[in-house]
């Protein structure tokens, strides 16, 4: 039976791969990963590596995820492996129902529409109509390779142009509304493009699938940024901008760093900080913290040094406190002088931001400093009280 990809994604995310594999073989830490002697071929020198979401043997080529490991190591069928892991994760394997099949059909169709829209936006960016948007991105210091890597595009002027273009491929207006690309006004009876006169930023899930968009207006209009609405494939609370690229970067040794905006993420990746991600126009959520900890045991939160950025840092720190454990913590880094990561890199280059990361503080120290600054009182008694609260 075919299982919904969303269920399989959640099962893989909830399954601690190193713990599953560690039951059958001895593993040792190797940087951010684990390694051991491959269970699938005889070897004396470890060449079997376990990452957050897959294993790979550089000796025999064995490769797979948690489901694949159970199948290969136990000779289990696919469904047997899924049922075993789901039971351990406290998940129910979905039964084949007409409703489940319809929900999966909807998700598939939304994915197709979003992918087609991304391609259309990218084409427009490199047509004459997208010249101003392209110049804007280049003037912000982005290279053409970076623009293409992140799939940046140009919405066009709206007026139904997207529906007209995608309609040629059989994508109907109703599907574009469901995908968060158009909106219907019941008062006027008109359906309009959600994004127009905006630079487009595809939002991708952790597996690299386009699930929504953010759009930045050209010029000084408001709102500066618009994000797509909640849909069957997109949740602002659960997803992180840049997570697909950051997962690979962190796997290769990059620091996982959380910044505030799309351009911050892109500028950091271009400068070589391949673990950069950002929340999607909202304060950091518990779901996003969980996603961060799936990638790294100690992400660095790096918010702007202005009052709004410091409030965001304090809220994120407060949210994380009940969730901390020996293998799940945070660091906080602050950019002084009113800069953000994007502007800091343009002024000082890679070294400027590296200095910020190097100065990142463990959560307790950083939160203590935030509380001290907020209080305006620096007496020894108050400092001791703050420290006691943080260590409770």
Task: Put a short name on every predicted segment.
Residues 1-101, 157, 163:
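N-terminal structured subdomain of primase-like DNA metabolism proteins
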Residues 14, 18, 75-82, 107-114, ...:
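Amphipathic alpha-helical transducer elements in NTP-driven molecular machines
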Residues 30, 102-117, 130, 156-295, ...:
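Phosphate-handling DNA/RNA-contact segment within nucleic-acid enzymes
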Residues 67, 256-258, 297-308, 313, ...:
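Acidic beta-strand-to-loop metal/phosphate-binding motif
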Residues 80-135:
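Conserved active-site segments centered on acidic
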Residues 319-327:
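Arginine/glycine-rich "motif VI" loop of SF2 helicases in the C-terminal RecA-like domain
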Residues 327-392:
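C-terminal or mid-to-C-terminal helical accessory/interaction module adjacent to the motor/catalytic core
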């Amino acid at each position: 039976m075919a299982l919904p990809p969303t269920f399989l994604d959640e099962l893989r995310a909830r399954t601690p791969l190193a713990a599953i594999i560690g039951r059958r073989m001895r593993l040792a830490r190797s940087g951010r990963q684990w390694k051991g002697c491959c269970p699938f071929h005889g070897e004396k020198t470890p060449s079997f590596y376990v990452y957050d979401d897959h294993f790979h043997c550089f000796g025999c080529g064995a490769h797979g995820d948690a489901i694949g490991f159970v199948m290969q190591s136990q000779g289990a069928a696919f469904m047997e492996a899924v049922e075993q892991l789901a039971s351990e994760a406290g998940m129910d394997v979905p039964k084949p129902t007409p409703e489940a099949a319809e929900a999966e059909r909807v998700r598939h169709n939304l994915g197709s529409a979003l992918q087609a829209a991304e391609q259309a936006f990218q084409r427009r960016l490199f047509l004459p109509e997208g010249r101003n948007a392209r110049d804007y991105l280049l003037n912000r210091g982005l290279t053409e390779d970076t623009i293409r890597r992140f799939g940046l595009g140009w919405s066009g002027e709206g007026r139904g142009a997207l529906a007209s273009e995608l309609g040629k491929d059989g994508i109907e207006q109703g599907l574009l509304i469901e995908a968060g690309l158009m909106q219907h006004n019941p008062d006027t009876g008109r359906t309009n493009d959600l994004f127009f006169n905006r630079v487009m930023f595809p939002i991708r899930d952790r597996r690299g699938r386009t699930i929504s968009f953010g759009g930045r207006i050209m010029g000084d209009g408001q709102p500066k940024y618009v994000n797509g609405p909640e849909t069957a494939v997109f949740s602002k609370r659960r997803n992180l901008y840049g997570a697909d690229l950051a997962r690979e970067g962190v796997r290769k040794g990059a620091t996982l760093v959380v910044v505030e905006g799309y351009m911050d993420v892109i500028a950091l990746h271009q400068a070589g900080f391949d673990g950069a991600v950002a929340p999607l126009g909202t304060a950091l959520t518990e779901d996003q913290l969980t996603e961060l900890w799936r990638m790294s045991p100690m992400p660095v939160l790096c918010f702007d040094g202005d009052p709004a950025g410091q409030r965001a840092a304090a809220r994120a720190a407060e949210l994380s406190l009940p969730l901390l454990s020996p293998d799940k913590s945070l660091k906080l880094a602050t950019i002084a002088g009113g800069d953000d990561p994007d502007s800091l890199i343009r002024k000082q280059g890679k070294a400027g931001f590296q200095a910020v990361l190097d100065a990142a503080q463990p959560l307790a120290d950083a939160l203590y400093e935030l509380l001290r600054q907020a209080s305006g009182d620096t007496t020894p008694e108050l400092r001791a009280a703050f420290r006691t609260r943080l260590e409770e």
